[in-house]
């Protein structure tokens, strides 16, 4: 709770189309199959539950055919690009638009985050925050206990969404620094949920160390945000190096691996670098000063 992060979107999209239909069906380009809203299929369970959850908010029971075009997965490869959060964001926008329910980006974030909390889907919700913006997003995580208290009080979905969430901040960042982010797929898949479970199991033994880690991380993230906004690529690279050092400090006491050997080699071949997400797989980031403007290059060939 209250932890901050800078998260960037990637030049890959999830697009959702909806059209009127006699019954509600879901088709996606990954599974290449269509299922009914109440039809049993493990590949669609999350989406089916989310659609039913949205009806609590919209109070609308229109039937429709929903199609999901997903560029964040390909050829059965998991890239670690936050696709589950992005899918739910795209579905929420499509359904609310289809049902003529007004919304803004904050509404969409809260709907997806609340659904995840109610279904015990752990995580920072950073992928959700990144999915509502293009480019870089500054995100401060809400106080989860504040939201859980509203759930325990049996407040309606609409009441919870319309309440200001303690600690939540989502802000679009406009980078001016001449910096290139070189994002590369490692080919080594990692499940963020497993890292979260592992940390929850051991965190009570390292309360002070974790407090130091979070305090340092939040300070460095704010510094990096300022570096990016002030055309200060040199300072940004230095801040990124310090962020990596802090993550390796977390690794030292949490025993959660941050970098594989492949990732270390990639990072050390760039001016600065770090893992993406919870570490140990999926995407690794290299950073270089350039002579043009801020840019992100995503390479999904296996490292």
What label would you give each PLM region?
Residues 80-103:
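DPxDG-like acidic metal-binding loop motif
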Residues 67-68:
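Hydrophobic alpha-helical hairpins/lids featuring a short glycine-rich hinge
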Residues 1:
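Short, Gly/Pro- and small/polar-rich lid/capping loops
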Residues 62-64:
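Residue-level recognition of the N-termini of beta-strands and the immediately preceding loop/turn
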Residues 7-48, 52-60, 71-77, 97-103, ...:
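C-terminal nucleotide
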């Amino acid at each position: 709770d209250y932890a901050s992060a800078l998260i960037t979107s990637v030049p890959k999209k999830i697009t959702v189309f909806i059209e009127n239909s006699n019954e509600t069906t879901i088709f996606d380009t990954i599974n290449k199959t269509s299922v009914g809203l109440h039809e049993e299929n493990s590949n669609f369970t999350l989406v089916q539950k989310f659609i039913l959850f949205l009806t609590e908010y919209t109070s609308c029971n229109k039937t429709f055919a929903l199609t999901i075009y997903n560029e964040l997965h390909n050829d059965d490869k998991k890239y670690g690009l936050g696709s589950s959060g992005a899918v739910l964001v795209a579905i929420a926008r499509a359904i609310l638009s289809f049902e003529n329910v007004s919304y803004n980006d904050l509404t969409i974030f809260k709907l997806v985050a609340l659904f995840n909390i109610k279904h015990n889907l752990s995580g920072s919700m950073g992928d959700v925050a990144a999915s509502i913006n293009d480019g870089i997003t500054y995100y401060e995580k809400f106080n989860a206990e504040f939201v859980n208290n509203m759930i325990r009080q049996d407040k309606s979905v609409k009441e919870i969404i319309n309440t200001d969430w303690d600690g939540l901040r989502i802000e679009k960042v406009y980078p001016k620094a001449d910096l290139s982010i070189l994002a590369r797929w490692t080919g080594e898949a990692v499940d963020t949920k497993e890292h979260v479970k592992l940390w929850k199991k051991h965190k009570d033994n390292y309360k002070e160390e974790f407090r130091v880690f979070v305090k340092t991380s939040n300070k460095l993230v704010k510094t990096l945000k300022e570096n990016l906004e002030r055309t200060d690529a040199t300072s940004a690279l230095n801040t990124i190096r310090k962020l990596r050092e802090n993550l390796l400090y977390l690794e030292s006491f949490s025993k959660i691996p941050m970098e594989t050997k492949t990732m270390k080699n990639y990072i050390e071949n760039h001016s600065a670098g770090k893992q993406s997400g919870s570490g140990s797989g999926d995407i690794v980031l290299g950073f270089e000063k350039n002579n043009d403007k801020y840019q992100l290059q995503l390479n999904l060939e296996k490292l």
